């Protein structure tokens, strides 16, 4: 017998009430164990989408997912940072957080980048990295070794979260974003102690930063970019939540105060896989457009803050721009590529 009544739990969600930690964990375990009918799963996913998700609901589900993750190795004993967005902003930008991962790693930050292919026909982090020569199906021991040897690695989500495979057809059939799009950034198998996470909607700022706090992160930045970007944006003021030692601070980030130029999000457009690959190659060598370089530097400054490397965001911007100018991200990319071969 389930520890909760599924009809009662569904009714609770449909009434837009917050479900408890026990209920959220029971629901996730039922999904992972294939205990619910497809129609029940569809109803729960729809009900969760229709209500305002809470930090407790997210962290409770994420804990179950992390525990179910395949990880037959000791966790790397280094202070790691993940950088990603939830997606769903519709802006079709190039792979900003992927570029940021290599820029910041080239400056000494240890990056555990957790990502996947795009489910929307766009170009996800895994798509662009594979196109550039990163081996997604590398033996998991090499993925672990890379972070110890090169201070950066890429964790291809399906290789670690095989328990979610049975849900993939239903999620695809629903055709809309679900709670799993929010959970993806929260379930990095390496359990980094710091993270920079972008959200496409401002109402997700507080639930996501609260979830990160519940999951035990020491430092984190959750950002909602101007113009609805799930990255820090050059278009205008960015809403930010900073998490440090359990304390959450809300701030508005003015890009001009950081020495950057206001630019519309349209200047950050990506395109085909080949286009996005070319943009990353250019940025890794200090080329690309001014807007492309500056948005990567802006988001890199948040990673530097989260890592503790540089708490002054303006100085962080300068560090990132100089790294690109010296082609340091390209060297770091080539190191990872060789390590995973």
Swiss-Prot record:
Residue positions binding Mg(2+) 2: 230-231
**Under what name is this protein listed?**
Anthranilate phosphoribosyltransferase
Keyword Acyltransferase attached: no
Q: How is the cofactor bound?
A: Binds 2 magnesium ions per monomer.
Q: Name one process (GO BP) from the record.
A: L-tryptophan biosynthetic process
Q: Which reaction(s) does the protein catalyse, per the Swiss-Prot or TrEMBL entry?
A: N-(5-phospho-beta-D-ribosyl)anthranilate + diphosphate = 5-phospho-alpha-D-ribose 1-diphosphate + anthranilate
Q: Which protein family is it in?
A: Belongs to the anthranilate phosphoribosyltransferase family.
Where Mg(2+) 1 binds, per the record, is at 97, 231
GO terms for molecular function, please? anthranilate phosphoribosyltransferase activity; magnesium ion binding
Q: Where does 5-phospho-alpha-D-ribose 1-diphosphate bind?
A: 85, 88-89, 93, 95-98, 113-121, 125
Enumerate the residues binding anthranilate 1.
Answer: 85, 116
Question: What is this protein's function?
Answer: Catalyzes the transfer of the phosphoribosyl group of 5-phosphorylribose-1-pyrophosphate (PRPP) to anthranilate to yield N-(5'-phosphoribosyl)-anthranilate (PRA).
* Primary enzyme class: transferase
Cofactor section: Mg(2+)
Q: Where does anthranilate 2 bind?
A: 171
Q: Which cysteines are joined by disulfide bonds?
A: none
The top of its lineage is: Bacteria, Bacillati, Cyanobacteriota, Cyanophyceae, Synechococcales
Pathway, per record: Amino-acid biosynthesis; L-tryptophan biosynthesis; L-tryptophan from chorismate: step 2/5
Checking Gene3D superfamilies in the record gives: Nucleoside phosphorylase/phosphoribosyltransferase catalytic domain, Transferase, Pyrimidine Nucleoside Phosphorylase, Chain C
Q: Which UniProt keywords apply?
A: Amino-acid biosynthesis, Aromatic amino acid biosynthesis, Glycosyltransferase, Magnesium, Metal-binding, Transferase, Tryptophan biosynthesis
- Subunit annotation: Homodimer.
């Amino acid at each position: 017998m389930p520890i909760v009544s599924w009809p009662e739990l569904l009714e609770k969600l449909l009434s837009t009430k917050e479900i408890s930690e026990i209920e959220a964990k029971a629901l996730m375990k039922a999904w992972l164990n294939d205990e619910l009918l497809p129609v029940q799963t569809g109803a729960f996913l729809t009900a969760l989408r229709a209500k305002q998700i809470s930090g407790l609901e997210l962290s409770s589900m994420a804990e179950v997912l992390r525990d179910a993750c395949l990880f037959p190795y000791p966790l790397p004993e280094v202070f790691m940072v993940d950088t990603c967005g939830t997606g769903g902003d519709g802006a079709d930008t190039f792979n900003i957080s992927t570029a940021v991962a290599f820029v910041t790693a080239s400056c000494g930050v240890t990056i555990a980048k957790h990502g996947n292919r795009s489910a929307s026909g766009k170009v996800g982090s895994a798509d662009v990295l594979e196109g550039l020569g990163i081996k997604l199906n590398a033996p998991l021991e090499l993925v672990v070794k890379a972070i110890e040897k090169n201070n950066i690695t890429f964790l291809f989500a399906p290789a670690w979260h095989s328990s979610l495979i049975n849900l993939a057809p239903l999620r695809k059939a629903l055709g809309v974003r679900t709670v799993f799009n929010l959970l993806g950034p929260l379930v990095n198998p390496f359990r980094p102690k710091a993270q920079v996470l972008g959200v496409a909607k401002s109402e997700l700022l507080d639930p996501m930063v609260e979830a990160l706090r519940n999951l035990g992160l020491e430092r984190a930045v959750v950002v909602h970019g101007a113009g609805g970007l799930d990255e820090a944006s050059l278009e205008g003021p960015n809403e930010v939540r900073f998490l440090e030692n359990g304390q959450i601070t809300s701030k508005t980030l003015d890009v001009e105060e950081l020495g950057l130029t206001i630019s519309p999000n349209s200047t950050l457009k990506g395109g085909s896989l080949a286009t996005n690959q070319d943009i990353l190659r250019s940025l890794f060598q200090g080329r690309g457009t001014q807007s492309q370089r500056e948005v990567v530097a802006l988001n890199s400054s948040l990673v530097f803050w989260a890592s503790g490397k540089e708490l002054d965001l303006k100085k962080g911007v300068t560090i990132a721009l100089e790294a690109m100018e010296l082609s340091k991200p390209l060297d770091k990319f080539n190191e990872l590529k060789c390590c995973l071969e």
